[in-house]
Regions:
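N-terminal beta-alpha supersecondary unit
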Residues: 1-17, 26, 119
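Conserved hydrophobic residues forming the short capping helix/wall of the S-adenosyl-L-methionine
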Residues: 4-8, 46, 160-163, 167
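Active-site catalytic microenvironments for nucleophilic, acid-base chemistry
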Residues: 6, 10, 44-52, 69
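Short pre-catalytic strand/loop immediately N-terminal to key active-site residues, enriched for Gly-Thr
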Residues: 17-29, 170-172
Length: 185
């Protein structure tokens, strides 16, 4: 709904819609489900708008303007490419992953509110140590939200400890603001 309202605000388009959304990504899992839904809605609205009004075209850069206002990681969801995210997920750089990997997602069925995780985050105490960094294809994998997420859901630490012991794992960590963890093989 926020995507639709923001799109209308930008374009002045008052066309009526009924939007049905089937959710398959768990809420509060740190997998960007809500952000992906918002991005998909923006992409659809742009397509419909541009088909209806051939004279006034909404550009991709217009979508990025809206996406940045709606949420820091929504712009990344407008892409369908390998990306390196930093900052709050709002600094996006295309990144080629040279190897083929297999991914394991472990979701402990804990709904972690992004706001609660950020409220438990302290910029002052945030220090990256080498033991917290994981290298993959010359990329450093590091998630600043891991410590506050573990504070709220200690099970995350158990999952990561288990993942670390799996043979042939090349990287592991927590996705987004948690609670889903991943292993890369």
């Amino acid at each position: 709904l926020e995507s639709l309202n923001a799109f209308r605000h930008l374009t002045g388009w008052d066309k009526k819609f009924q939007i049905n959304l089937d959710k398959y990504i768990p809420i509060g899992a740190g997998l960007g489900g809500g952000s992906a839904d918002a991005a998909a809605t923006l992409i659809l609205l742009r397509k419909l708008f541009n088909e209806e009004r051939k004279s006034k075209v909404v550009s991709i850069s217009n979508l990025y303007e809206i996406a940045y206002r709606l949420g820091s990681d929504i712009p990344a969801c407008l892409e369908s490419k390998d990306l390196k995210l930093s900052g709050y997920g709002n600094k996006i750089k295309r990144q080629r992953i040279s190897n083929c990997y297999y991914y394991l997602l472990v979701n402990p069925r804990i709904n972690l509110s992004t706001n609660k995780v950020f409220n438990n985050f302290s910029f002052l105490s945030e220090q990256k140590s080498d033991k917290d960094k994981i290298l993959l294809d010359n990329l450093t994998i590091y998630n600043s939200l891991l410590k506050p997420a573990i504070h709220l859901a200690p099970q995350i630490n158990s999952i990561l400890s288990t993942l670390k012991t799996i043979p042939n794992i090349v990287a592991y960590g927590m996705s987004g603001s948690g609670s889903t963890c991943f292993g890369i093989f």
